[in-house]
Amino acid sequence: MAEEEPKIGVYICHCGENIAGAVNIEEVKKFAETLPNVVVVRDYLFMCSDPGQELIKQDIKEGRVNRVVVAACTPRTHEPIFRKACEDAGLNKYYFEMANIRDQCSWAHWHEKEKATEKAKQIIAAAVAKARLLEPLEDRYVDITQKVLVIGGGIAGIFAALDIANAGYKVYLVERNPSIGGNMAKLDKTFPTNDCSACILTPLMVEVANHPNIELLTYSEVEAVEGTVGNFKVKVRKKQTWVDWDLCTGCGACTDVCPPKARVPDEFNEGLSKRGAIYIQFPQAVPKKAVIDIDACIECGGRKFGTEPRKTKDGKPILAPCEKVCPTGAADRTKPRNPEGELIELDVGAIIVATGYKVMDKTHFKEFAPDSPNVITALQMERLISATGPTEGKLIVPSDIPKYEEWKKKVAKGEEVELEARKPHRIVYVSCVGSRDERFHTYCSKVCCMYMLKQAMLLKEKYPDLDIYIFFIDVRTPGKDFDEYYMRCRQLGIKVIKGKVGGIRRMPDERLWVRGYDAEIGKPVEVIADLVVLATAIEPSDGTIELARKLGINIGAEGFFRERHTKLYPVDTMTEGIFICGCAQGPKDIPDSVAQAKAAASSAMSLIAPGKMKLEPLVSEVDKEKCSGCGICVPLCPYGAITMTKYNESMRAEINPALCKGCGVCAAACPSKAIKLHGFTFEQVLAQVRTLAKRGIVEVL
């Protein structure tokens, strides 16, 4: 059939009113009939429907056409459908070309019907010009590595890893912190059922650690990614812990003796308390191992890592406090350790990104007195009310946390003393701090309304006399049982005010003067509060942009990883074989994060399960007889698919089809025109350009 005279069929889709509402279909049909080699022109309401596809199949089977052009919507979503129709009818599917007259024409010129119709003609003419030169191509098959890398050990990463591992596939779970758990581990309870967060999460963390198909790589980060779908090569940097994890039992003896000078803000408690230079991330940590923060360590007694200890006059070694108390020798500083840690290489077939989120820092909001210790973020409030938090769940104002710590030390010594820290009597919540705000983020952070209501409910139930105000722009409760949850909060006596807070002023006694506006009564409101909680925006986690660069995936305008298609492919990325889920993709609550994680896991398993993968032949190929061996193409390839190899005693470029993604950069740059991009050859593209030039659309040099 390749040697036959092209017999082109043009099939024009109405797409309901999406195309027909702006393009005169009958006029376009008459125009298409005049184009060279066009023998059949048909239109249909929805060409992608079964009856629409049947029109194409029937014409192919009856020998009317041997090339197919469909003028419809985007090839991104519909090209596979029409290729399959051609293949089912016995025609090589690469004898198909698509003309996008919806996205590039009708939608772009909805109110200019004459121009839209004329543009549709030109797009179809260019597609027909290319169709005359199409070549039959064959799909390629490559072996797939049946292993998956999951980046991020929060609730989304945990579920993705478990689903894949339970299906019998090897999973590498990489987490940059010493423990998995993510932000969910910091929460006290979860809405709308008020379940204990740790009670839900901890068993899952333990299951991950004990699963035979999961290799847990905590305190590690992805350093580089090479290869392509089915065969990624990933370099992971395991950071130096300065503690022998093979010996560490997680007893915590070392953390108790770390001197005050080495104490720094505790990241897990969101800076409300301090931790030692040697620390275990949190009580339920998995793995529960100590880590030394080398930047905080003061090298007690001049004890440096990798050196023998100094000795006293009587010959006893002078050890650092953590060394002295460690029962297993895990903190032994004599052992030499590489400060760069260890670099390991992994071969995987698919990658799932579940890197989570961070909360926006309060220091951006000068109008809300961010310098006051009693103005905190909602995530800090989670730690304040948690039994594993800095005050063990006792509600006191953050400015008095040092008093609580002193009281705790005295109690530990057996002293009977009362806690003199101030308890808040009035708490004010401020919603949409940084969200829905053109100065910062225009998007809604989705979970803020519900977690403010949750915290207020928990506090009101535990402390009935507590006076709680919540300033909302709008109350958004669009989930299952969410609105009932909101009504329950109102019934408890929590004061919900529709309106914005204009400013907060710090008072000399560390209380806070809150000035807001009540939109329902149309008057300003003033509240003197002991504690203010800011519902700051959910933001992409630190390192998102750098990780996107390493993976070769896109970032959206809001800073989160961008999905391939919002509705059809919400967990896929534009880089095949790499999936996203959870808050890495955008703000969402725990159920939505879990659902998306399971979807990403399912997509990854569908990819690796066959063991082989079909690749399109739309890749570049070098004609070594024409190649001059200049090597210009090698550094230009963004996928590392081109190498220089020996050919007839000379060096020539060679393209690995398994790595090539068909971007065409090499073909465009080759001065010898020795590189051919199948499906987009020089002749095919030039034919399209010349067709448009004849009609006055473009100029050709």
Curated annotation (Swiss-Prot):
Domain of life assignment: Archaea
UniProt entry keywords in alphabetical sequence: 4Fe-4S, Cytoplasm, FAD, Flavoprotein, Iron, Iron-sulfur, Metal-binding, Oxidoreductase, Repeat
Position of the signal peptide: none
Protein EC: 1.8.-.-
Keyword Cell inner membrane: no
Sequence positions that bind [4Fe-4S] cluster 2: C627, C630, C633, C670
Domain 4Fe-4S ferredoxin-type as annotated: residue spans: 239-268, 618-647, 651-680
A GO CC term attached to the entry: cytoplasm
Cofactor: how and how many bound: Binds 4 [4Fe-4S] clusters per subunit.
Cofactor: [4Fe-4S] cluster; FAD
InterPro entries hit by this protein: 4Fe4S_Fe-S-bd (IPR017896), 4Fe4S_Fe_S_CS (IPR017900), FAD/NAD-bd_sf (IPR036188), HdrA-like (IPR039650)
PROSITE patterns hit by this protein: 4FE4S_FER_1 (PS00198), 4FE4S_FER_2 (PS51379)
Binding site for [4Fe-4S] cluster 1: C248, C251, C254, C326
Subcellular location(s) of the protein: Cytoplasm
Chief place where the protein resides: cytoplasm
This protein's record includes keyword Disulfide bond: no
Listed GO MF terms: 4 iron, 4 sulfur cluster binding; metal ion binding; oxidoreductase activity
Residues that hold [4Fe-4S] cluster 3 according to the record: C637, C660, C663, C666
Positions bound to FAD: 152-175
Family: Belongs to the HdrA family.
Assembly and interaction partners: The heterodisulfide reductase is composed of three subunits; HdlA, HdlB and HdlC. It forms a complex with the F420-non-reducing hydrogenase (Mvh), which provides the reducing equivalents to the heterodisulfide reductase.
Biological role: Has oxidoreductase activity. The Hdl and Mvh subunits may together mediate electron transfer from hydrogen to an unidentified electron acceptor on the cytoplasmic side of the membrane.
Protein name (record): Heterodisulfide reductase subunit A-like protein
Gene assigned in the entry: hdlA
